[in-house]
Design a protein with these regions (language model features):
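Generic detection of intrinsically disordered/low-complexity segments and helix-coil linkers/edges
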Residues: 52-53, 222, 261, 268
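Contiguous transmembrane helix-bundle modules in multi-pass membrane proteins
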Residues: 1-184, 189, 272-301
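Soluble non-transmembrane domains of integral membrane proteins
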Residues: 173-262
Length: 301
């Protein structure tokens, strides 16, 4: 439909086709930037023999500034009209989303009680996409793909999960003896006991850890293991994980003994589950869009 407007030889930024075009340009630049960061070290090595690496600082300084406006447009673009959209009408359309974004952002920072600029930007962008596409799905806005709205909703969940697990993660490495206690975030962890267990093809030392919240209510029991496989002569560590919608908490049992205690690694990763849920929602949105398009093709044929 947008080709009808481009055929008149003018371009309006505040329109659905304008947002699509700008977003496509931004995403193309992001892909080119990532590709450059991937192949540049190979090119340098091929011509000079020198080995260089392109790491996180490059992508943070190049990709992030480009992806932020793309995400903002992703939230507002679907609400715009074809051809030309009045600016006041745009504000009227996005006002509920702005309010919802502010409320959810305040709620998330109230839960984690830790502020950072990166976390603030990431959470705002995530809830901006989530709230806009949630409104689209609830209001059942005409001429808008349900599959696309679901996929964009999933992108918001994915960004939320990545932000939370990157900004608020915490880890602790301690040596603990039986009945020893340590704390990470709002959880108290007690090393209850050590058991020797035997599996079908291995023997193991299993740690028993009790996890309590700030009100001294037991949250879960975690049982990491150190396993030994005699036939293959291999030692492995098996982490024990407790997951909910707010965080992953897992413990890894290292080397040790009864006299000196054991090395214990404790990891606190917030919102990780939303990375997986967001990815599944994006996949679901793609399947729904494909199904709708196949139906349209059958009708046309």
């Amino acid at each position: 439909k947008s080709k009808n407007y481009f055929s008149n030889n003018y371009f309006v930024f505040f329109s659905k086709e304008g947002s699509i075009l700008v977003n496509n340009i931004l995403m193309t630049v992001v892909c080119a930037t990532v590709l450059l960061g991937t192949i540049y070290p190979l090119i340098v090595e091929a011509f000079t023999g020198s080995k260089i690496s392109v790491g996180e600082p490059y992508y943070n300084s190049t990709v992030v500034p480009i992806i932020i406006p793309a995400i903002l447009i992703m939230g507002i673009g679907p609400l715009m009209a074809w051809g030309r959209e009045d600016k006041l009408k745009i504000l009227e359309k996005i006002f509920p989303s702005l309010i919802l974004t502010i409320i959810m952002t305040i709620a998330i920072f109230a839960v984690y009680q830790s502020f950072s600029l990166i976390g603030f930007v990431g959470v705002i962008l995530a809830f901006w996409i989530i709230s806009n596409n949630l409104i689209i799905l609830i209001k059942k806005i005409k001429n808008f793909s349900k599959g696309m709205a679901i996929a964009h909703f999933g992108v918001g969940l994915l960004i939320l999960g990545i932000t939370g697990s990157s900004v608020w993660q915490n880890e602790k490495i301690v040596r603990m003896k039986i009945a020893g206690e340590t704390k990470i975030e709002k959880y108290n962890i007690i090393f209850d006991k050590i058991d020797e267990v035997a599996g079908a093809n291995y023997v193991a030392i299993k740690g028993n850890f009790l996890v309590y919240d700030s009100k001294k209510n037991i949250v879960t029991k975690l049982n990491p293991e150190n396993r030994y496989y005699p036939i293959s002569n291999i030692f492995t560590t098996e982490a024990s994980i407790h997951t909910n919608i707010f965080r992953d908490l897992y413990i890894v049992l290292g080397e040790g003994n009864l006299n000196d205690g054991w090395i214990v690694r404790i990891y606190y990763n917030p919102l990780v589950i939303w990375i997986w849920i967001g990815s599944l929602v994006i996949f679901l949105g793609g399947i729904i869009s494909m199904k709708i398009n196949l139906k349209k093709l059958k009708i046309l044929s």
